[in-house]
């Protein structure tokens, strides 16, 4: 199995290295990641500047390709051009430093890279670890390898898109894996107002928990319980339930 690995924290991020090491147990790992930090860029794509893959070496051998672009750029360039003659079987994005759950999935460069893989019909998994003072990426990578290994074992997963989140508690002791829907709660809805030396106001985004997590079981609620969460996603944003009704609306140009 040929695995394309990327992330949004950059090619030198510890989460990428930890996941790369574990994914080697599942197959050949090709790493193509952003040259710099790309957190929160969502599904942005580079059109107006060239994408230049730069070989990164460790211990004298090629380790990864670094691209001055977004996570989605890395996957799109890889699948459409770099490895078009050597098909990729699995795209994995992570390990992100911080959870990607609830509505924040839509902001995530980590998840966007996996979505891009799914655009190409390749099974794709985004992996994120709860941010803490002492992130154990190695433990999270083992969890990710085990879950991903089970995902690809099932024919139904082929071409699918999956979002895996690992809470800190799960890296410290045994935890369950909960298959749950994406919640609608929003992390980080607050800003801190400050002033620069010139007296001008500016605002700093704060990473805060959702005010009122939903009562139903979602990724947000189960992460709070210390469970690993796995959510199957899709990128079709159509409101199918409204299509038929809207055809009867008196819509005119």
UniProtKB/Swiss-Prot annotation:
Subcellular location: Cytoplasm
Domain of life: Bacteria
Record key words, sorted: Cytoplasm, Hydrolase, Metal-binding, Nucleotide-binding
EC category name: hydrolase
Catalyzed reaction equations: a ribonucleoside 5'-phosphate + H2O = a ribonucleoside + phosphate
Binding site for a divalent metal cation: 8-9, 39, 96
Coiled-coil region: none
Enzyme Commission number(s) from the entry: 3.1.3.5
Cofactor entry: a divalent metal cation
GO MF: 3'-nucleotidase activity; 5'-nucleotidase activity; exopolyphosphatase activity; metal ion binding; nucleotide binding
Cofactor note: Binds 1 divalent metal cation per subunit.
GO annotations of cellular component type: cytoplasm
One Pfam family from the record: SurE
HAMAP family the UniProt entry points to: SurE
Function statement: Nucleotidase that shows phosphatase activity on nucleoside 5'-monophosphates.
Record-stated family: Belongs to the SurE nucleotidase family.
Name of this chain's protein: 5'-nucleotidase SurE
UniProt organism field: Rhodopirellula baltica (strain DSM 10527 / NCIMB 13988 / SH1)
């Amino acid at each position: 199995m040929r695995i394309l690995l990327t992330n949004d924290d950059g090619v030198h991020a510890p989460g990428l290295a930890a996941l790369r090491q574990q994914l080697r147990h599942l197959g050949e790992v090709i790493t193509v990641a952003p040259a710099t930090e790309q957190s929160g860029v969502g599904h942005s794509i580079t059109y107006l500047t060239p994408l230049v893959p730069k070989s990164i070496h460790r211990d004298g051998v090629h380790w990864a390709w670094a691209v001055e672009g977004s996570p989605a750029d890395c996957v799109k360039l890889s699948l459409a051009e770099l490895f078009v003659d050597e098909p990729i079987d699995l795209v994995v994005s992570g390990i992100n430093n911080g959870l990607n759950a609830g509505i924040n999935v839509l902001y995530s460069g980590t998840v966007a890279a996996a979505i891009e893989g799914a655009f190409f019909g390749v099974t794709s998994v985004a992996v994120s670890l709860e941010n803490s003072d002492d992130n154990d990426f190695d433990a999270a990578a083992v969890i990710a390898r085990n879950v991903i290994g089970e995902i690809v074992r099932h024919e139904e997963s082929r071409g699918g898109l999956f979002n895996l989140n690992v809470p800190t508690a799960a890296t410290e002791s045994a935890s369950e894996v909960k298959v749950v829907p994406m919640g609608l709660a929003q992390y980080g809805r607050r800003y801190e107002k400050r002033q620069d030396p010139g007296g001008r106001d500016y605002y700093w985004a704060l990473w805060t928990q959702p005010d009122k997590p939903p009562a139903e079981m979602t990724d947000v609620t189960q992460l709070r319980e210390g469970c690993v969460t796995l959510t199957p996603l899709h990128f079709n944003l159509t409101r199918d339930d409204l299509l038929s009704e809207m055809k009867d609306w008196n819509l005119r140009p």
